[in-house]
Amino acid sequence: VLLLDASVWIAAKDRQDRYFDPARTLAVDPALPVAALDLTLYEVANGLGARRGRHDEAIDLCRLVAGRCGEGLLAVDAKLIESALELAAEHGLTAYDAAYVAAARRHGWTLVSTDIADLVSKDLAVTPDAADYP
């Protein structure tokens, strides 16, 4: 299972993003098992809707995330937050980024992100074009 962070979902809607094509494939191909955190919905709404003013697209994308992930849309719990805080301190991450890392590790999933500086460069995630499709 590929755990897609918000950056991947947003890249799948942005034709100008360098990861548009592989992100789009991950976001829409029903043959590829994907998951997301409930946090992802807020990050998508913030990144696409609040920051870029693309409210309708943000709502549509949140619906896609929820529909595409189904039961793979994970709720953040206290244990995940505890793990996330440990990872945040260890790797100099935000609690948000660390939550994705913690969830991927808990479930044995691959974290996919376009966040080169904070996640990919630290070998905590792979880019959409490097994700191993099952």
What are these regions (language model features)?
Residues 1, 37, 73-74, 101-134:
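Acidic, PIN/NYN-like endoribonuclease modules and their adjacent C-terminal/linker elements
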Residues 1-36, 50-60, 133:
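Short, well-structured N-terminal submotif of metal-dependent ribonuclease cores
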Residues 33, 94, 108-110:
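Residue-level detector of anion-binding/catalytic polar loops
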Residues 46-50, 105:
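Short glycine/serine- and small hydrophobic-enriched flexible loop segments
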Residues 8, 40, 80, 100, ...:
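Alpha-helix capping/helix-boundary segments
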Residues 15, 38, 59-90, 102-103:
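Acidic catalytic patch
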Residues 38-46:
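Short, conserved active-site loops that position catalytic residues or coordinate cofactors/metal ions
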Residues 5, 97, 115:
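Acidic active-site catalytic centers that drive phospho-/nucleotidyl reactions
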